[in-house]
Structures are given as C-alpha cells and as structure tokens.
C-alpha cells in the first residue's frame, strides 16, 4: 500500500513518512536492498532523525557493503551511553574492519565492550577487541591483559580456547617466557605449534636458570623441553 501511494504520481506532504514506513517494512523483512532507497530518501528529507532511524540506515548500508556510509551514520550515535550506542560502536567496528581501518575498529570495539547493556554484544566486541589488540598492539592497555580479561569473563565460551592460544603467543612475543609457559599449561589441547613453543620456552628458561647457577630449577625446565 505504501509503494502504491508513492507510485501514484502525486506528491504529498506525507511522502517522507511513507518512505520511512515502507523502508522499515522492508528492513523488518531483511530485504535491505529494497529498504535502502526508502530509508535514504527519508533521511535526506528528515531534519531531526531519531537514533533508531540512523542505526537502521547504518545497518542497511553495511549489509549492502556501503561501509563508508555506514560509518557516517554510526558515528552520529556514539556520543551517548545507551544500548543503541553500544550496538552502534560494535557495528562501527565491523564497518571499519571491512574498510581496512583496523585502529579505528579497535577503538570502536573497545568502547562497545565497556558497556553492559547487551551481554552478547559486549562479548562479541571484547572478542574482536582482544584479537585486534594482539594483531596491532594496543595503545590503551596491555594486549595480554585484554585477552586474559576475555578468558576470565567467558571461561566456557566457544572462543575461549582460541583466546588461550592467542594469550600464549602474546606473552611469547612480549618476551615473558614464564607467563607463556603458565598460559600453555592452561590449554585443553595443544597443537604442534604450541608444543613447539613449549619446548623452546622451556629450553630458554632452563638456560636462564642454568646461567644463574640455579641448576635444580634449570633441570626441571630442561625436562619439559
């Protein structure tokens, strides 16, 4: 019915609102391709769009791989502390990631992970924040602490073992071999890669203790290598 009103060739003062209704109808059906032009026309004419309007347009744009547009809409939503802002920060991180702006994505995921409104979104955001912290380094806090926070918060999560492996590598690359070995000991299953890391780290720690004259301690490490 909404499309019929728009297609009858008569412009009315209600056209803007009709575009919104039609666009949201398509949005609710998951037909983002059809929703996009209607929501776009509505936002182009609406001087004071609601936060929900902006979020919907950002989400639709992202689904259609118009990620630069999505970033623009989401960025209008992140100046508040609200459930919608938490979601917007997470989706903003996804859009930045799609465009290769990983540092910006890291910051967006961090902000989303610090909000408690939606536990599922918080978990997803913290997962991405931890992964990017490991990959890029983290200007806000120690990467290993971020990964450990995920493990502590979601000890039985589906991604926790993956995070434990990341923690091993994070400690290894920072040169903290004792923490690396401790993290290795908490893995449920060890891959060939982590077994090799365990051998090498044990040997390095053994050599350190041997050079200090701590032969008994060194022997324990050498037995693990």
Tell me what each language-model feature is.
Residues 1-225:
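Acidic, polar-rich low-complexity tracts and alpha-helical solenoid repeat scaffolds
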């Amino acid at each position: 019915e909404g499309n019929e009103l728009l297609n009858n060739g008569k412009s009315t003062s209600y056209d803007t609102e009709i575009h919104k209704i039609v666009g949201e109808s398509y949005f609710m059906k998951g037909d983002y391709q059809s929703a996009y032009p209607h929501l776009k026309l509505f936002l182009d004419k609406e001087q004071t769009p609601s936060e929900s309007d902006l979020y919907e347009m950002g989400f639709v744009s992202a689904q259609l791989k118009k990620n630069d547009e999505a970033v623009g809409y989401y960025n209008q939503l992140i100046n508040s502390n609200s459930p919608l802002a938490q979601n917007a920060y997470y989706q903003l991180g996804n859009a930045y990631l799609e465009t290769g702006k990983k540092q910006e994505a890291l910051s967006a995921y961090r902000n989303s992970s610090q909000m408690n409104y939606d536990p599922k979104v918080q978990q997803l955001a913290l997962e991405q924040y931890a992964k990017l912290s490991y990959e890029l380094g983290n200007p806000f806090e120690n990467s290993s602490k971020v990964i450990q926070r995920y493990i502590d918060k979601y000890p039985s999560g589906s991604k926790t073992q993956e995070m434990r492996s990341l923690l091993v590598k994070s400690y290894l690359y920072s040169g903290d071999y004792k923490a690396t070995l401790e993290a290795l000991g908490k893995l449920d299953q060890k891959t060939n890669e982590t077994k090799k890391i365990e051998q090498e780290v044990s040997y390095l720690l053994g050599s350190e203790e041997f050079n200090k004259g701590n032969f008994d301690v060194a022997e324990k490490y050498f037995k693990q290598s």
